[in-house]
């Protein structure tokens, strides 16, 4: 399965799968066949929630740096549900600013998890069916990366099935309490 932009890669992907004996099992194909019909809608819904949440963060915390897909790419159907958030920091030295930012990241994540425990999780998974996952890549997915190259930012992955208004409310509480 591919879109028009990835069609030229399909032959190379097939070759890789054959060489590495890494093709999906029959059970995996069955699961994919079951889930595929609703997958496109779930992707659209997750992107919609993520775009709305990112726009909200821009409104209430404009000095934050957010890495998220551009509207131009999204118009070409590249619609992820993951964004990175680099919170504004304080301090006189680089060390103070970095230390403050790391503590602030954890405060945000813990507040979201504490206030919305049924939907917000401290996790590295993406593409979930429900809720919102939060992580700091430097402490999870970048375990073998050199310390100086690690990203001490917040990364969030939203689904299409979550209480977006509650997440906005708690984020605003964070901004008003800590920023």
Where on the chain are the PLM-derived regions?
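Terminal helix/beta-alpha structural elements that buttress the NAD(P)+-binding lobe
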Residues: 166, 173-178
